[in-house]
Regions:
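An N-terminal assembly and electron-transfer interface module characteristic of large anaerobic redox
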Residues: 1-351
Length: 351
């Protein structure tokens, strides 16, 4: 919606798409990481559907620029498109100007677009918090999902206009509505979901882990996606202090984190005042906690942030954690599975 309001005719591919895995395996070597197979498979599958004019369509994919193989998804995608007979389809790389990524003259981040994207991400994190916290306890099946859908329709215009003032108005109403919805007076075990970013959030990639946990009688707790953005920015500060990166990049990162914190502050305040919901974690506090277990120089994959998320979950009495590890994602096996026992056995980070 945010990109459509910015003048781009964007189609968001479905979150549930099992066939994408089979298509991806046809055109991507099975030694590549699972997220690459799924995301490239979805794009090729969409072009094969016949719904798009192949001479007037582009495919859009994010590119990180870090040590993760997500940096190399673009050439993998181009090869897949060529092998599938779609060599004429342009590939647009979406990045925040990181080193090692491609530039696209036809696609630019403008201030109005950034505001719309910020509002969209804030709503995404907010709905994830309130829905996952209340749905396992609903007194009537489907009640929370219906309320969620009703609010999605109401806030769509706000995503299009990018107004933070209107967001804050709706945000307080959403929290109040979900705070007052009648729930069963029972307590279920909480299960945190961490891991590689695509597998953590994509129902196709994680076999709809949130619904599965709820069906098994648990309450799923999934960390915010804005936290991952703060993690990426915080890494620029660490690189300046430890690897000689430019002071300008450090200042830009600090400024961006400050802006994000400023934008999130009203939501954090409203969440903390509520009965059912917890506030937003500071990236600086998370880095300090994680540094007691591993080096903040671990930036590949989800890096130190994955460990930090586990610590935050434990600090909020979420004592069960599912760590989503995609096949072939070597960095996450180290910073995820490699340290998963440590937060429980190291009392210092939880103090």
């Amino acid at each position: 919606v945010a990109l459509q309001a910015s003048g781009y005719h964007v189609v968001c591919l479905p979150a549930q798409d099992k066939e994408a895995v089979n298509v991806g395996l046809k055109y991507v070597n099975n030694d590549a990481c699972y997220p690459a197979i799924i995301s490239i498979g979805q794009l090729v599958e969409a072009l094969e559907s016949g719904q798009y004019d192949l001479d007037n369509v582009s495919v859009l994919m994010t590119q990180t620029g870090g040590g993760c193989r997500a940096t190399n998804y673009i050439p993998l995608l181009r090869k897949a498109l060529n092998d599938a007979g779609f060599s004429q389809v342009p590939v647009v790389s979406v990045s925040m100007g990181n080193k090692g990524v491609e530039s696209n003259p036809g696609f630019k981040f403008t201030l109005p677009m950034i505001k719309r994207l910020v509002v969209a991400f804030l709503y995404g994190d907010l709905f994830e918090r309130v829905v996952y916290r209340t749905r396992p306890y609903e007194t009537e099946k489907g009640m929370v999902d219906q309320l969620h859908q009703d609010w999605l329709k109401r806030v769509e215009a706000n995503v299009r206009n990018g107004s933070l003032t209107q967001f804050n108005h709706f945000m307080k109403k959403i929290i109040r509505t979900f705070d007052e919805i009648p729930l069963q007076e029972i307590k279920k075990p909480k299960v945190g979901v961490v891991g590689e970013i695509l597998v953590k959030y994509s129902p196709t990639a994680n076999n709809d882990i949130v619904r599965l946990l709820e069906e098994e009688g648990a309450e799923a707790v999934v960390p915010d996606i804005v936290g991952f953005m703060n993690y990426s920015l915080y890494n620029q500060i660490w690189k300046y202090e430890n690897m000689g990166m430019s002071k300008q990049s450090k200042r830009l990162a600090e400024f961006a984190i400050k802006i994000i914190e400023l934008v999130e502050k009203p939501m954090d305040k409203a969440l903390r005042k509520s009965v059912r919901f917890d506030g937003i974690h500071s990236i600086y506090d998370m880095a300090a906690d994680a540094s007691k277990i591993l080096s903040i120089g671990n930036h590949t994959g989800e890096g130190w942030f994955l460990t930090a998320e586990m610590i935050e979950l434990l600090k909020h009495e979420v004592n069960n954690i599912v760590c989503m590890q995609p096949f072939g994602c070597l960095p996450n096996h180290i910073v995820g599975k490699g340290v998963i026992e440590t937060p429980w056995t190291t009392p210092a980070p939880l103090g």
